[in-house]
Amino acid sequence: DSLVQFIHQERYDIVMTLVSQRAHSLVAFNWRHERDALIQLAEKEGISYEVIDGTVPAERRKDIVQRFQAGQIRTLFCHPQSASHGLTLTKATTIIWCSPTYNAEHFQQFNQRIHRAGQTQKTETILIQAKNTWEPKVYKKLNTKLGRMENLLHILKEVS
């Protein structure tokens, strides 16, 4: 679409630099314009990729996961809501969050896609944030939510 302008080009450049330095990675995007910018850069740089978001049918998603796990795809661009449950993506060793999310459950569950049985390598999660924006506050709020979730689960374990 000729009306689209990517205003966070540096963000996408950083993400793709990180992707190019790793064998297999997952990149979480929250917005369609992020997905589109990442796809554009991956194609420009010749990086093999697939997308998992709400537009991808279940059978295609299954095929994408199998090809990724077989090493045929270098990176997956994923919307966390569409890829945070039921997928094992242990071929990846890195998760890169292109921008912050407020949703603690999606954040936690998406990060667990590479921390599963079958993961034999060291893993990392990278959070991209812009200085002098609301993004550091969002990540701080997200960490607070995660702490509360962990405390609640601990209390529930003690009660049961």
Regions inferred by a protein language model and the residue ranges of each:
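A conserved SF2-helicase RecA2
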Residues: 102-160
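Short, well-ordered beta-strand core segments
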Residues: 76, 95-96, 114
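Conserved Helicase C-terminal RecA-like lobe
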Residues: 1-76, 81-87, 153-160
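Active-site acidic short loop of glycosyltransferases
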Residues: 70-73, 91-92, 120
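Cofactor-binding loop segments of dinucleotide-utilizing enzymes, especially the Rossmann-like FAD-
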Residues: 30, 54, 100, 128-130
